[in-house]
């Protein structure tokens, strides 16, 4: 969203709909807009916005809480540390539809059966949120995002009815469940996010918490009833219209299970690595693969530790995957290549090997005990971890061939 559009949108917002709102809101219509997923990782969860139409002036304004700028100074650093800055922006309906048509994303709108006074309140609150001192917030993918901001705004307008209807009612899944099914189109991103998520991601969600997903806000709003002027319960949604239907970037209804294919990858790594015990050049390919595994898993473990202790990402804390992708593996690499010292394994080697082996065991027990839903990471990492450890141990204990006796 350009700075020019933001300035123009702000001026228009504070002028036309606010004037109609102050006139009682009779001329206003309020819509929940739900955008389908896109191709990029930050588009995979979908999006939503609130559209206010002023039937007197013909002005259509779309309020979007998901605005950010990659080029903003410090954005990448704040994103990495879990403190990205997003803001509320406003644009025209025409610009919004052209943007989503360009990115081949669906757009569905639901007109809300709000009394005139509530529509006026909604327009005024959105205009107030757009003020420079109010429009910026610290974004969290699961707890405070474009969708939860829309959810919370609607709940305030509805006098808490949305929260009352959904809080405590079991949802469809967990943060991990919804994340897996949303990003399954990108194998590398899928595996990375799956590894990075800790046990917080496995806590069951109620319908209120599940509305971090725009599609869930759409569903709950569709189901909700409110009292009309006569005190009768009527659907909150007057009508639902599809403004754009492309259907290119679908999200799976259930999460995939990659355990089988990841187990095969782990077995392949292990089979090649075990040949590293061969003497001479015959063992070099196996030791090379074992080294690559220890480097990859060790660096991954360091990243997990950073996400756990060094950032504000709630979903990455207390992550048992660190036990399976252990940084100690980086220190095992010299054992794959050096000749055994005459005195045998040193105390450091024993301590290092023991720590690494215990770590793998802890990771195995954690998965079996249900401490964290990381079966796919276990399938990938456990057997290669054990095999590379055994190969390093065998090579370290193997006697050095005796030199030929000079004649």
Regions found by a protein language model. Give the residues of each.
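N-terminal signal peptide c-region/cleavage motif recognized by signal peptidases
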Residues: 16-18
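Initiator methionine at the very start of the polypeptide chain
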Residues: 1-2, 21
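General structural signal for secondary-structure boundaries
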Residues: 91-94, 115, 174, 255-264, ...
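Generic detector of multi-pass transmembrane helix bundles and their immediately adjacent loops
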Residues: 295-407
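Sec-dependent signal peptide recognition
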Residues: 2-11
């Amino acid at each position: 969203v350009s700075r020019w559009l933001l300035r123009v949108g702000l001026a228009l917002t504070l002028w036309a709909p606010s004037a109609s709102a102050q006139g009682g809101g009779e001329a206003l219509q309020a819509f929940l807009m739900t955008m389908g997923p896109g191709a990029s990782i930050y588009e995979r969860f979908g999006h939503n916005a609130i559209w206010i139409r002023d039937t007197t002036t013909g002005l259509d304004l779309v309020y979007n809480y998901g605005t950010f700028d990659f080029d903003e100074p410090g954005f990448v650093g704040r994103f990495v540390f879990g403190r990205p800055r997003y803001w509320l922006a406003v644009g025209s309906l025409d610009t919004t539809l052209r943007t989503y048509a360009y990115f081949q994303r669906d757009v569905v709108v639901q007109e809300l059966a709000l009394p005139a006074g509530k529509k006026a309140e909604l327009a005024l609150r959105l205009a107030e949120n757009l003020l420079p001192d109010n429009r910026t917030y610290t974004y969290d993918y699961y707890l405070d995002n474009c969708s939860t901001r829309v959810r919370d705004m609607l709940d305030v307008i509805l006098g808490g009815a949305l929260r009352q209807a959904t809080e405590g009612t079991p949802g469809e899944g967990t943060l991990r469940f919804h994340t897996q099914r949303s990003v399954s189109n990108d194998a590398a991103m899928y595996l990375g996010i799956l590894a990075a998520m800790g046990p917080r991601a496995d806590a069951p969600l109620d319908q209120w918490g599940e509305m971090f997903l725009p599609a869930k806000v759409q569903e709950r709003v569709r189901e909700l009833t409110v009292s009309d002027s006569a005190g009768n319960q009527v659907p909150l949604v007057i009508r639902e219209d599809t403004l754009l239907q492309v259907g290119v970037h679908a999200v799976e209804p259930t999460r995939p299970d990659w355990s089988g294919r990841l187990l095969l990858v782990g077995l392949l790594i292990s089979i090649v690595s075990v040949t590293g015990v061969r003497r001479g050049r015959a063992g070099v390919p196996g030791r090379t693969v074992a080294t690559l595994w220890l480097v990859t898993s060790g660096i991954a473990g360091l990243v997990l530790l950073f996400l756990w202790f060094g950032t504000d990402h709630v979903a990455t804390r207390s992550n048992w995957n660190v036990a399976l992708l252990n940084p100690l593996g980086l220190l095992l690499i010299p054992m794959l290549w050096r000749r055994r010292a005459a005195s045998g394994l040193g105390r450091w080697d024993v301590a290092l090997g023991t720590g690494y082996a215990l770590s793998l065991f802890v990771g195995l027990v954690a998965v079996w005990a249900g401490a964290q839903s990381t079966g796919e990471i276990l399938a990938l990492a456990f057997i290669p971890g054990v095999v590379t450890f055994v190969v390093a141990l065998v090579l370290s204990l193997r006697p050095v061939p005796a030199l030929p006796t000079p004649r």
